Amino acid sequence: LDIPYTGGNPQCLSYCYDKSLVRGIAKEIGIPVPQAFFVNPMDSTFDVTIDFPVLVKPNFGDSSFGITRNSVANSAEELLQAITDIRKKFGYEKPILVEELLTGKDLTLGIIGTPPGSFQTLPVSEEDYSMLPPELPRICGYEAKWQPDSPYWSIKSVRAELPPDTEKALVEWSVKLSERLECRDYTRFDWRLDAAGIPRLLEVNPNPGWCWDGHLAKMAAMGGMSYSDMLGAIIKSAEERILMEYGANIRMKEINMRQEIAV
């Protein structure tokens, strides 16, 4: 349709919504990820190659669909039940990713702009689980985002307090991933610290929610940016990018025309 738009292109979205693919790309460029293994569609047997507890999630998708308190498994029996639950809800033809359950700080970092061009990083935010009943696993899944009557709705986002080296790594790795995956205009990166305090990539979110109470808006507010200014910055990034792409296309057409005339 040739209609300009903000955010990632179809290729970027298809890459980022494949969690195992993003993991592979991250590892390839030296970015830490949780230990994990893959369960193929219709597999009835598989090797458990990591220690419990684990987090079971659909390999494809976004918005935490399929990730609930029941996605945390502390035994083989609970793992099989979690896999069965996902297959019943999302289909037996869908692959499943099983990751080690990290319990360090649960972090997210936002970028507005398009690296390596003009961009700005937003303050790192942390999920505050202090109001969550102690018996529930500390994860920010579907219940925290879509079910107001859930105890997970009590989770708050606060500005993260991190060692300078850790924050520096988060920014550098997020920018590196943004470039490699060709994310554009606005992106959010989810991380979690391991037992040694090392950030490990959970997910890359191209075109993350920009609603007024979403993570991106909260991080922008932490950095002193109003909601309208955040939206304006996203649109400005897209305008600058589209103008550059348009100019490059015009120049290429001019070159092709000259070559045709010369022939």
Regions found by a protein language model. Name each.
Residues 4-5, 33, 54, 227:
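Hydrophobic beta-strand scaffold residues
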Residues 8-11:
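Short beta->alpha connector loops at strand-helix junctions that form conserved
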Residues 27-31, 161-263:
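ATP-dependent carboxylate activation and anion-phosphoryl transfer catalytic cores
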Residues 76-165, 195-200:
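Phosphate-binding site of ATP-dependent enzymes
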